[in-house]
Structures are given as C-alpha cells and as structure tokens.
C-alpha cells in the first residue's frame, strides 16, 4: 500500500468518521486526530495514504476517486488554511476534477451545482 512510515508517526491518523447530511446531500466527516493533522503538514505521501486507509477502514463506502482527492486536498491544503479544523467534509456527489481545480475550489469542487441539486430536492 505505501512505504514504511517514519517512527515519529503514531497510528491511526483518523480518529473517527461520521456520515451526515448537508441540506439533502450526503457528506462524510473525517475527524483527524492530532497526529493526523500534524502529519498533513509534512511532505510525506506515505502518511496521506495511511490516513486514507484509516478513513476506508472506518467507512468503506468512501472508496471513490472524488472522495480520495478531497481528502488529500484537505491534508495538503486546508490544514494550512484552517489549522484548527478538526474534520474534513468529503462528499461523493462532488465531481472528479484535476488537482489544480480541486485546490482552486478549496477542496470542494462543484459547490454551486451541489447546492442547486440539494435545493431542488431528491430526484
């Protein structure tokens, strides 16, 4: 799965996850612990892979390309913007986009489309 981690890391990186609804759209909240948030600030791909593995262990239904990309974005970007944020919101309804688009959207691509979809109600 990934290369061995530095002995400075303490596993797991993710404390718990919780499926919720935002308006009428489903969202997975992934709660990183202190070690997970600290490791997100390191240029260590193995730590990101291990943390994503924690998410999948806790919520196997999260195993989609778009949710993985959102999680990695939160680790690489959002931790610097909102360092005290304890959870990452990952939504399966968001579009799969390239790295530059997901970073430009603050890790939440397709936000306006999702809101419109939620406001229109279930289909």
Swiss-Prot record:
Cross-referenced InterPro entries: DUF2599
Pfam families: DUF2599
Family designation: To M.tuberculosis Rv0477.
Protein name in UniProt: Uncharacterized protein ML2452
Organism: Mycobacterium leprae (strain TN)
